[in-house]
């Protein structure tokens, strides 16, 4: 193309990448000739090798890729990251390294990701892929967990305080027999009733903080925290909450309130209760956490967290870090939503 037009290769590059460096007539001539010759423009791979910039952000999540299409809160979060990337002229690469993926394959995916930095979404501190991300030596922002990772910025919420406020509300209605349906507490495949040992040492900070929030509220209300019935769900499936609700009620038929650490669990639990003739809230109080549109539409009592904003801020912190160069922790506000699914015990 340069030979055809009798110009330098720099001129060709400027026509595609820095049009302000050329006159409008010259750039139009370059583009028209390129189209006639079938030349699509500079090779992006070659350009990234030369500039050492990939022009993309890697979003690492220890979940199957389908999780971000099935879970509404996670979907909003990804949309937020995508918005910040789009506004700042960057691409977004999803790196899904869920439990079903072989460790070697997942490691290769992280090592081979052509990105300028990573947003790591809600993993435990000993997650093997987190260590691989850190070994890349690229900028990193963590979302939700792990907390307190040295030298790394984080965006999240105060999970303990948010869950404490919700539990205070439930206990204030008079409930004393409470079941708590949680997302997975560790990386290993386990679900069902949670024993005391596992309950005291969850690998995931978010679930641990939400459990502690309920315990603190129970203790303040004079209720033994050890009386809390906890059921763990490993997978995020439409029926997960219903399965967990069944297990909780079988373990303790005296339960009058089911608190859930995610709206997706609460909505599924409500479906199970309705199918079994248990009226909400007349016979059972149900609460969630996230504030997703489906939950709000069904009147769920829940905690709303700004998932979209969380994604946006994570992307912005990665792409436009503080001038100080020091890591920051941003704690976003939550809101207790008093819906139609909580009432006094029957």
Give the location of each predicted region.
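Short beta-strand scaffold positions
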Residues: 2, 120, 259-261
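Short acidic/polar active-site loop segments enriched in Thr and Asp
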Residues: 8, 55, 116, 175-177, ...
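A generic local structural motif
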Residues: 43-45, 103-108, 126-128, 243-247, ...
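N-terminal helix-turn-helix DNA-binding module of bacterial transcription factors
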Residues: 1-53, 346
